[in-house]
Regions:
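Conserved N-terminal beta1-alpha1 strand-loop-helix module at the mouth
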Residues: 1-101
């Protein structure tokens, strides 16, 4: 299954790297991002990483009526110290715009 994902994303990753190397920087990479490791190692950290995805290859659609911002706000309120937000579109119905919400 992982090889299937890798092959599906290979061309997209090449294009993103080409754009980056040409100096084209787009959101969410145009500003500093919180440190994932720092969130996990803070003394008051719960150590919980919450994952947001709109679909999965094995389960299909997952709660499409909730926006990424709503879901992630709920995860943070419930104690998550870090978020994993899937942006892969073909298999997980994600989008890079999820990272700017």
């Amino acid at each position: 299954m992982l090889e299937k994902f890798r092959l599906a994303k290979e061309a997209e990753v090449r294009e993103l790297l080409r754009l980056r190397d040409a100096g084209h920087v787009h959101a969410p990479w145009d500003r500093p991002r919180p440190g994932f490791g720092a969130a996990l190692t803070r003394s008051e950290s719960s150590g919980i990483i919450a994952e947001y995805k709109r679909a999965s290859p094995s389960k299909g659609d997952i709660n499409l009526g909730v926006t990424p911002a709503e879901a992630c706000t709920g995860y943070a309120r419930a104690g998550a110290c870090a978020l994993s937000i899937l942006t892969e579109s073909r298999y997980f119905k994600g989008d890079l715009s999820f990272l700017t919400e």
